[in-house]
Curated annotation (Swiss-Prot):
Pathway: Pyrimidine metabolism; dTTP biosynthesis. DUMP binds at residues 21, 126-127, 166-169, 177, 207-209. This is Thymidylate synthase. Its EC number is 2.1.1.45. Homodimer. HAMAP family: Thymidy_synth_bact. It catalyses: dUMP + (6R)-5,10-methylene-5,6,7,8-tetrahydrofolate = 7,8-dihydrofolate + dTMP. The gene is thyA. NCBIfam families: PRK01827.1-3 (NF002497), PRK01827.1-5 (NF002499), thym_sym (TIGR03284). Gene3D superfamilies: Thymidylate synthase/dCMP hydroxymethylase domain. GO terms for molecular function: thymidylate synthase activity. The keyword Chloroplast does not apply. Catalyzes the reductive methylation of 2'-deoxyuridine-5'-monophosphate (dUMP) to 2'-deoxythymidine-5'-monophosphate (dTMP) while utilizing 5,10-methylenetetrahydrofolate (mTHF) as the methyl donor and reductant in the reaction, yielding dihydrofolate (DHF) as a by-product. This enzymatic reaction provides an intracellular de novo source of dTMP, an essential precursor for DNA biosynthesis. Keywords: Cytoplasm, Methyltransferase, Nucleotide biosynthesis, Transferase.
Amino acid sequence: MKPYLELIQKILDTGVERDDRTGTGTWSIFGHQMRFDLRQGFPLITTKKLHIRAIFIELLWFLRGETNVKYLHDHGVTIWDEWADEQGELGPIYGYQWRSWPLPDGGYLDQMAKTLTQIRNHPHSRRHVVVAYNPACVDEMALPPCHALFQFYVAQGRLSCQLYQRSADVFLGVPFNIASYALLTHLIAQQCDLDVGEFVWTGGDVHLYRNHLEPARLQLTREPLSLPHLRIKRRPPSLFEYQYDDLEIVDYQSYPAIKAAISV
C-alpha cells in the first residue's frame, strides 16, 4: 500500500492549511488518484490494523439499502453512531440512494440492481455508474456522501471500479473506503462471472485533519507488509444476500492500530 503512504507524504509536503465544517481544521490537496491491482492482493493497509468487520458489515448494510444503525448494532458495529438520531436514523444516505433513488413520478430506481444487469448484458457499456450524492436529498442526510460516485469497467473478462470521493479523510476514512469498494468489486465480479481488475480511487478534497498529523507521521515510519487476500466462501443467489460469514481475509498481517479522534 505504498500509494497510500505516498499520499500522506504528499499532503504533509504540499498541503495547504484550511478551516473546515467540523472546526478541527485540515491540511489538504485538491485532486489525487491511486490505483490498486486487485489481482495482486486485497488492498487493506498494513501500517496500522484496520477493523475489518466494520468495513465488511458497513458495505453489506449499504447493499441492503438500509439507513438505520440497528443492522450495524446487531453485528457489533458502531461507526455511524455519532451521526444517527435518537431512533438510529441517518436519513437518505448511501444505501437509500444506491437501492431507492427517488424518481420524479414518485417511484424509485434500484441503481445497484440496474448496474448489475447492465454489466451482465452489456459489459462494455460506459454507463455502469452508481451515484450516492443526490443534491435534492442532501439536507435530509445526517452526513452527505463523501464517496459520491463510482463506475465499473469491463475489459478482457476483468471488472474494474473507479470511485470518486468528494471529501477524503485520509487517516481514518480512506483506508476503509479503499477496502469497501475493493470488496464490492469482488462481489460484483463473482455475481457476473468475471475476474477482478483494478480499483481506482480518485479524491477531490483530500485532507488530513490537524489532530491526525502526528498519527499520520507515525504511519510513515512503518514499512508496508505483504497484502492479504480475500476469500469468498459462498456465492448467494444475488448481490444483496451476502453475509459476513461468507467473507474471509487470509494472511492479514499489520502493525498495531493507531488511535485518532473522528471529526463530526
